[in-house]
Structure formats: structure tokens, C-alpha cells
Amino acid sequence: MKNNNAFTLLELMIVIVIMGLLATIVMPGIMNRPEQARRTKAIVEIRQIESALALFKTDVGRYPTTSEGLAALVSNPGVKNYNQDAYLDKLPTDPWGNPYIYICPPIKGKYYDLKSLGKDSEEGGTEDNSDIESWNNEI
């Protein structure tokens, strides 16, 4: 009797084909992760900004106006009861390097509109290019 402990050429080719098929299925999911990580970071940063806005409202009695913008969370826009240490250390930018958009009074949100334009830096978009909005269920 012959002892066959080695793979035949056919068995090796079948394994290589299966690995190739698995790679084509798995790779798109792996390659998309960096963009998903950026979107998740934007969501977390929007939540942090919302917390700073809530503290500002507690101290000052109102949210910053659109003209004061998010800069009001970094330096006093000339209001009473401003707590310099309680808000943000620096003006945030989204993971794509663009400023977050803040509007108060809001157009779509309940108290204010806060959003990132996403990967394409343009209004609207779908999937990776969609806007990340504080009033959206994604957050």
C-alpha cells in the first residue's frame, strides 16, 4: 500500500480557487472599514459637541446663535455665566477635515442643526457620501 500524505495538484487547485472566492467575498467588507470608522468618529464627535452645547445652554440659558457658531464653545462670545473650562478646547473639524455645520435656530432639528457633510463634502449624498446629521436616527 502506498501512503499518500501529500496533496495532489487537483486538491491544491481546488483549495486555491476556494480561497480566491472567499477573498472576493471578504475583501470589499474589509476595504470599506476605514470609511465606516470615519463615519463612526463623526457620530461620536457630534455627540460630544451636543454635550458641550447642552452645558452652554445650562450655563448661559440658550444655545449659541448661528452667527456665534461652534466658536462659542471655545471662546466667550460676550455672554454672562460663560464657563471657559466646561465646553471645548478647540474648534472641531469632521474626520474629512471640514468644519461641522451648526445652525440655530434650526431648520430640521429640534433645538439646532448640527451636521457633517460626509466624505464628499457636499449636501446630501448616499451611503459613504451621505451627511451625518444630529437629528437623524443614525446618531
Predicted features by range, described:
Residues 2-30:
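N-terminal single-pass transmembrane signal-anchor helix
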Residues 6, 85, 111:
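A residue-level signal for beta-strand positions that form part of recognition/binding surfaces
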Residues 24, 40, 64-67, 82, ...:
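Non-catalytic, surface-exposed connector residues within folded enzymatic/regulatory domains
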Residues 36-39, 54, 71, 95-139:
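Short, surface-exposed interaction loops/tails
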Residues 58-108:
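Extracellular/periplasmic head regions of type IV pilus-like filament subunits
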